[in-house]
Amino acid sequence: AAKNYNDVIIVASQAQYKPLLDMLMEHGATSSLEERRWMAKEAFAVSSHYDSAIFNYFDAGEGSAFRCSVNSQKQLRYGENPHQKGYFYGNLEAMFDQIHGKEISYNNLLDINAAVDLIDEFDDLTFAILKHNNACGLASRTTVLDAWKDALAGDPVSAFGGVLITNGVIDKEAAEEINKIFFEVIIAPDYDVDALEILGQKKNRIILVRKEAKLPKKQLR
């Protein structure tokens, strides 16, 4: 039916019932080619998503072909550059709770992904600083404060404007030291109330609480 959109309207979802009725009532029970084409596109979106899910199930990760279909999307502030558009497909809320700051950008997401990949390599209490997807400081110590100080000592210049991540709970003492530099994003499994008050003093600073969900073992770039 979708292939015959020149003469046929296909309805792929219950959510389209009301818009379709409104359209038919407005145009005297007729539709334009442009409207039928749009409905056909929506139908193929549904069927291709279904077919991709079936293929990936039977392919079982063998990688004979890459087919990915994700319905949910989040528009980002911009893409890699300000004049470009950027979208995130998936459920970011399954990984993080954003409790403060501006919207996450495309470049923020790249750094966040690299940061999570890096910190997951460590079982000991660790603090890492990343800039442009690369670590510019990292330390494993017995306290978050000591780990932060030694990670920063690795390259205090490059840390400016970076992404910070730790696998430990950030307390007030650590937050007071961290707050002395400018950074874009900070990620931790939790924060003390006093620490949040300190780190939240900058309006645009992105503060993320990382949930227990793990990144997939297999990634395609």
Write out the residue ranges for each language-model feature.
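Active-site cavity-forming subdomains of large catalytic enzyme subunits
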Residues: 1-5, 11
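Active-site loops and adjacent core secondary-structure elements that bind or stabilize anionic groups
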Residues: 4-5, 16-191, 195-221
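A structural signal for short, well-ordered beta-strand segments and their strand-loop junctions
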Residues: 10-11, 129
